Structures are given as structure tokens and as C-alpha cells.
Amino acid sequence: MALVTSLITLAIFFMVAAPKDAFALRRAAHHHRILHHLGVLWNPLFRPSHDSLLRQNEEINRLDLPRIQDDVELEALKDSGALVPIEESESLKVEHGLDPSRRYCRPWTRDFLQDLSEVYYRQFHDQIQVNSAVRTVKVQKKLRRHNRNAAPADGDTASSHLAGVTVDLQRRGLTKEEIRFVEHYLFYLNALGLVEPEEERRHWCFHVMVSDRYSDWRQTQTIFPQSPTQEPVAAPVPAVAATAASN
């Protein structure tokens, strides 16, 4: 309870403390590229990038996690407890079209989902929705045939969904306030090296890879940063990779 209350305070703090024009520098750096989808401004804090995919895979390599090849490997990881089920609750729901066999993730990723969904629910009285979780290489290859923008199924930029550390959270339909709330929540965790997020435009979702350090960190409840002088103008790029390099 103390952790959830503190996380709510933290997210609200970042929202209130930041000036409205803080994204100006970041917009200029991207040559004022303003995109719209159904009339909604697309200007995410965490843009997908090659470097982000590299960082996600570096973290998976640090953890020595396998890229799950097929359903046989997937079921074995479930049986061993290495993958745990994502269960719906008052604060969390799962997209109805997501195959029940893939409603699984690593234990620390589920911890992250539980905390974020409870914080979000207390603030907005609505649920966070999980659109995607663990995938197999077989599934990822099939996805690539239908979506050329999907991450590869192998190599240094392979999809982090293949290791079960990543979830996609619904972004479509959220208000500006709700999006800003989630972005600032992720910004702080990213700065601590606990998550590596991206905001995907094609599927309008928050793609979030979670480090195993999250479970240990959440037990400390030492989550209050120094007061920011302005809203973040760009995501703290080297977060996960820098932390991994120190181990």
C-alpha cells in the first residue's frame, strides 16, 4: 500500500511540476515533425529506435534469458514458473483477442504491471490494458510477414517479447492527461534503469521491457527523486544499458 501511494505521489508530482512548453526543445530536435492520427497529436516521449532495441537485447543477454523458439519451450517455462500468468483484476485487463497461451510474462514484469495498474486505477478509476506479452520466435516471424515494422525474430535487435520481459500496454483512447501520467511514470523508472519503454504509433501502445532489478527495487520503496526543474525534454537514453554495464 505504501509503495502504491508513493508511486501515485511521484507520478502526480512530475505532472504538476513541469511547465507546459517543456517539449519544445525535443520537438525542434525532430525538425518539428508533427504527426496526427485521427486528429490526435502524435508527439511521444519515448520514440522507437534502433538503439532502444539494442538496449533491450543487451539487458536480455545480461540476464542470460532464452529467446523462446516455439510452444514447446513456452510451455516448459510456464511449468517451471519462469513465466507467470497475467491475471485480470479491478485495475488490469487483457485485450480479449490475446491468445490465452501468451498471457504470460516474467515475474518481475508482472510486478511492474501490478504496480502501474494500481497507481493508474487510483488516479483515473480505469484499467490499464495489456495488448501483448510473451511471444515465440515462430509467432514473431509470422507477425513480421504481416507487419514490416515489427522487430526481427533474431539478431541484436530481436523483439524483447521473445524473452517474456516485455508487455505492450494500450495507448489508444487515453486522454492527454492519462498519456502524460504514464509517460512520467515510465520516465522515472527508465532513469533508474528499471524499464526500457517505447511508444509505438502503428499499434498506439506503450511497449515496455522490464529489468529483473524491478522486483528488488520495489521492495526498497526509495522512489523519490530530486525535484525536477522542468519536464523531461527527452528520454534518458542510456538507462538500462548503463546499469547493465556496471554489473
Where are the model-predicted features located?
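Catalytic cores and adjacent binding grooves of peptidoglycan-active enzymes
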Residues: 16-27, 152-247
